[in-house]
């Protein structure tokens, strides 16, 4: 019998306690109350002027050391309860989606927050004594009310009042199984909740009650109290509040309570939710099972005294800073930095190394334009409102570049302004950004992709066909399009076998290839005599298949049974040709590169995908936020992504931008839709200005990232640069180090613990230590 791994044993020891967590949350979700009156929350309502009613909620808290199994325990909730699984950040939601194999939104998406709300800033509310849960809720609601007002107004326009008033319980339960939202379940799970400001908790509770009241759902009618499951670590990265100063044109950023420290540290809140009975603490690190590494994480998690032995242990990871900053060292490792500027600087140095011709594991540098358009009329109105008459469009762009797109990693990119054009209507600026082929990227939002080809080996493509894995993962809604796509790929790929024989000048192989039997359903217009005559008339350089078989029908011109018949026949031909090729050229043929596209494709300079065809077509679907895609290049071919985006940006700017081409883990090639969004500037008086539209590609490099972005991820190889920052926090060290899955694959430029010897214990750590000694707290080892 094989020896059981430490990871398996640790997970099995957690099993019984995880079952208890599920049952406790199930009981909390069954609590009902008299539903609060929500009609008072209208356009005229303002919580600062008139406090609202108590919005009841329950809460279950899951905390613990990084990698201890907090996030993976969410899968038990997903399997056993009807619950809405969300992440606090895009990275957290992507990791959840990967674990659960389903789409998990961010909590912001779940309660209706959109990109246009980014620049609506929370209020600054004066501090005051808060003795009751009602006062605390109203205080938190006041902060976020400008955003919540916009969200509920939009929801009220899209959804009919009383939409589910007459729905039966059976029909509603069916709806809940089909789609999980704030109005189909009262269990809301938030992973990495420690990164969220405290007012987000009240925002989620408010939106739950408002949405269910507006729709008059069975949940509202029965008074089902929302159960918010907060997962994370209060001692990891801090939460921040930001306010934008329009006069100075800069953000003022301040630390604030995160949801977990708010729940744990606020006596009124912790007593309201009965925290001592609704708190699970995960103890052992399962991401990396090295005992010394686990002890290091516990020391940081609980702010324990740092022993000389711990100091010596972390000294092992220290290497010269120059090695980490050198892109030719630690190839394939993810660099972690404290600031966006450092990420950008590292990427620039990597790109410089590629420009000078230094070989970095076969990587190749290419550039793509990013475009911005500032609208003159709106910009002049904005300047007048904020009393900045001398501010120019280019000055505003330089100061607000980091705010132009809808994700924080936009500013990390190595980009340079190369062209500015000013007209009466707008100022157009084009930037050039650098990317590296064959490096991995992640997507930052819901992006359409057009799957248009495959690049891999014959062996791997054969496995895909035989397992039908592509069909299983793509043919849920409209299988006819999936079969049509595969038919086209197979049909176009069969020439590869003939072309190889011509290249090798193997006439015997070509004769055998020409005499392979073709399925009758593809050649029904010909008699056997016709086929024999056609074969005899052709030269060896001609592939008989394409003379006998016309291209497969499209999804819109044939029925599903017809397309399946075509797919089965073409797959049989592919397998028979592959078998013949391996007979003639041995099994080494299976490892040869296999390429096929929906059109005749040429790749210029190994980067630009082009064709004599006027348009690139393929299988249209949404790109996975779960998967890491490998950059392959770009194409200027027109790609049909269905309904076009409505965001305003000049056509000449859009035409400058190509579509990024990526490869998924299976080998399929796809084009990504461009990320075009508009920037709304919202002033304190509620006045909004559509100042700018920006177009980029919505992708982030996995070569380097900030420590904050890395929270919630597991990284195989990590190189951390703490640099010379004067205010390194325990939370920074904790998050960065705990990303590692193997202590043999982690390096850093210094021992940051030496700067923290006199660091005071955090309030959250004090509460956690008390909880460890509380018999009512559930400890999961």
Swiss-Prot record:
SUPFAM superfamilies: P-loop containing nucleoside triphosphate hydrolases. It is an enzyme of class 3 (hydrolase). ATP binds at residues 64-71. GO terms for molecular function: ATP binding; helicase activity; hydrolase activity. The keyword Nucleotide-binding applies. Gene3D superfamilies: P-loop containing nucleotide triphosphate hydrolases (3.40.50.300). One of its GO terms (cellular component) is host cell nucleus. InterPro entries: DNA_helicase_dom (IPR003840), HSV_HELI (IPR034711), P-loop_NTPase (IPR027417). It holds the Pfam family Herpes_Helicase. This protein may be a helicase and is required for replication of viral DNA. Belongs to the herpesviridae helicase family. This is DNA replication helicase. It comes from Saimiriine herpesvirus 2 (strain 11) (SaHV-2).
């Amino acid at each position: 019998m094989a020896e059981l791994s430490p990871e398996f044993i640790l997970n099995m020891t957690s099993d019984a306690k995880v079952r208890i967590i599920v049952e406790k949350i199930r009981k909390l979700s069954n609590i009902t109350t008299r539903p609060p009156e929500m009609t008072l929350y209208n356009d005229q309502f303002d919580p600062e002027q008139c406090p609202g009613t108590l919005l009841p909620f329950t809460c279950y808290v899951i905390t613990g050391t990084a990698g201890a199994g907090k996030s993976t325990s969410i899968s038990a909730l997903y399997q056993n309860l009807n619950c809405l699984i969300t992440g606090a950040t895009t990275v957290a939601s992507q990791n959840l989606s990967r674990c659960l194999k389903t789409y998990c939104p961010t909590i912001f998406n779940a309660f209706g927050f959109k990109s246009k709300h980014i620049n609506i800033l929370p209020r600054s509310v004066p501090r005051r004594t808060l003795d009751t849960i009602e006062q605390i809720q109203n205080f938190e609601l006041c902060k976020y009310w400008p955003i919540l007002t916009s969200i509920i107004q939009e929801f009220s326009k899209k959804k009919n009042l009383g939409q589910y008033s007459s729905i039966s319980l059976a029909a509603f339960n069916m709806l809940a199984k089909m789609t999980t939202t704030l109005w189909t379940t009262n269990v809301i799970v938030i992973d990495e909740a420690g990164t969220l400001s405290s007012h987000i908790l009240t925002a989620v509770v408010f939106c739950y009650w408002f949405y269910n009241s507006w729709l008059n759902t069975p949940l509202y009618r029965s008074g089902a109290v929302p159960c918010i499951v907060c997962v994370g670590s209060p001692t990891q990265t801090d939460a921040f509040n930001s306010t934008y100063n329009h006069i100075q044109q800069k953000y003022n950023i301040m630390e604030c309570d995160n949801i977990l420290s708010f729940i744990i540290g606020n006596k009124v809140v912790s007593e309201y939710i009965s925290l001592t009975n609704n708190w699970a603490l995960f103890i052992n690190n399962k991401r990396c099972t090295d005992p010394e590494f686990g002890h290091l994480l516990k020391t940081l998690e609980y702010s324990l005294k740092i022993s000389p032995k711990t100091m010596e242990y972390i000294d092992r990871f220290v290497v010269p800073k120059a090695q980490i900053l050198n892109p030719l060292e630690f190839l394939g490792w993810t660099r972690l930095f404290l600031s966006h500027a450092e990420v950008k600087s590292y990427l620039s140095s990597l790109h410089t190394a590629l420009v000078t011709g230094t070989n970095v594991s076969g990587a190749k540098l290419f550039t793509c334009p990013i475009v911005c358009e500032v609208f003159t009329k709106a910009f002049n109105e904005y300047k007048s409102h904020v009393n900045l008459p001398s501010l120019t469009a280019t000055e505003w762009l330089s100061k607000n570049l980091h705010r132009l797109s809808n994700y924080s990693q936009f500013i990390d990119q190595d980009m340079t302004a190369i062209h500015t054009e000013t007209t009466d209507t707008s100022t157009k600026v084009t930037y050039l950004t650098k990317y590296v082929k064959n490096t991995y990227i992640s997507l930052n939002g819901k992006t359409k992709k057009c799957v248009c080809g495959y690049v891999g080996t014959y062996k791997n493509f054969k496995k895909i066909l035989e397992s039908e894995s592509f069909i299983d993962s793509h043919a849920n809604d409209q299988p006819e399009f999936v079969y049509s796509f595969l038919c086209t790929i197979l049909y176009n790929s069969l020439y590869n076998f003939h072309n190889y024989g011509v290249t090798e000048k193997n006439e015997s192989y070509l004769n055998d290839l020409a005499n392979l039997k073709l399925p009758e359903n593809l050649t029904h217009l010909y008699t056997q005599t016709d086929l024999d005559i056609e074969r005899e008339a052709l030269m060896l350089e001609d592939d008989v298949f394409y003379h006998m078989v016309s291209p497969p029908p499209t999804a819109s011109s044939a029925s599903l049974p017809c397309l399946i018949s075509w797919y089965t026949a073409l797959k049989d031909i592919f397998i028979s040709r592959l078998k013949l090729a391996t007979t003639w050229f041995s099994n080494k043929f299976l490892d040869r590169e296999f390429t096929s596209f929906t059109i005749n494709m040429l790749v210029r300079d190994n980067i630009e995908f082009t064709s004599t065809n006027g348009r690139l077509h393929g299988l249209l679907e949404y790109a996975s936020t779960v998967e890491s895609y490998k950059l392959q290049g770009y194409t200027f071919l027109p790609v049909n992504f269905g309904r076009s985006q409505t965001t305003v940006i000049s056509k000449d700017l859009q035409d400058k931008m190509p579509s990024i081409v990526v490869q998924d883990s299976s080998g399929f090639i796809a084009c990504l839709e461009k990320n075009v969004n508009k920037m709304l500037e919202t002033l304190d008086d509620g006045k909004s200005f559509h100042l700018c539209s920006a177009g980029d590609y919505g992708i982030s490099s996995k070569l380097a990232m900030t420590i904050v972005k890395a929270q919630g991820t597991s990284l195989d190889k990590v190189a951390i640069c703490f640099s010379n920052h004067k205010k390194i926090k325990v939370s920074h060290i904790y998050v960065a180090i705990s990303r590692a899955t193997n202590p043999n694959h982690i390096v850093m430029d210094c021992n940051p613990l030496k700067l923290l010897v006199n660091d005071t214990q955090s309030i959250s750590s004090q509460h956690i230590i008390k909880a460890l000694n509380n018999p009512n707290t559930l400890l999961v080892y």
